[in-house]
Amino acid sequence: MPNDKLVLVVDDDPDLVEAICMKLESKNYRVAKAYDGIEAWDKIQEERPDLIILDVMMPRKDGYKLCDELKNNPEYEDITVVLLTAVGSAVTSTRYTHQEGMSTLADDYIPKPVDLDKLMSMVDDFMG
């Protein structure tokens, strides 16, 4: 059954982006891809996603900055953001402190290496 929900996958690892997108497409989600925070912002302007899977550490603009920009913008604050992080053991909640000493407003996070089944379950829960 077709799904009109759009998920934007943002990571500087093209192989991971492809793997996540293939899994999402197998569950009939529409997908868009970006490889850094600046490209992601452009994609968000083109077509507003329902959910963003966002890597934390990327060139040009990192995931923390993009997440904070989205969550502090009334036009985009309701977009669900799931962070991908290699430092998941340091995360105790979604409003955790990152390197600059600021907290992030992400809706959830998943540690790397990514468990695709767990990520899909999280996406399904958020998409209702």
Regions found by a protein language model. Give the residues of each.
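Active-site beta3 strand of CheY-like receiver
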Residues: 47-53
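Charged docking surfaces used in two-component/phosphorelay signaling
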Residues: 18-26
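Receiver (REC) domain active-site loop signature in two-component systems and cognate sites
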Residues: 58
